[in-house]
Amino acid sequence: MQSMCGSWRTFPLLIALLATGGPVWSQERAPDPAISRRVARLKLARSIRAFATATLVHGECQVAQGRLERRQADQAMAIALQELGISAAVLANPQVRKAAAMLENNLDEACQLTGLDAAAAAKLVNEEL
């Protein structure tokens, strides 16, 4: 008769596992819905500020390049935000203004963002917005 190598060692572990109600990871609690909502709200606010920053820096560049007058750019930015249900008041947010100022040197003549890689963009969003 062959002995089952290690079976006498694993049996007490199985009993202990069953007695405790299963593995520890199965006892983890589901995240509190209130905390999940708060985190989602913060992420949404950051995304809104990021979109507003891109809108602002692009509009400012269009004015600086002489393609749009200030009034036209202001209207275009407000429309772009309103189409997504965002108030144009977010353009006056100090965080949005600061991030836009940081991005303006990374735009080319066509007002396209060229001098910023994905890591730098993520850092800007996480640290400034």
Residue ranges and their predicted role:
Residues 20-23:
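N-terminal signal peptide c-region/cleavage motif recognized by signal peptidases
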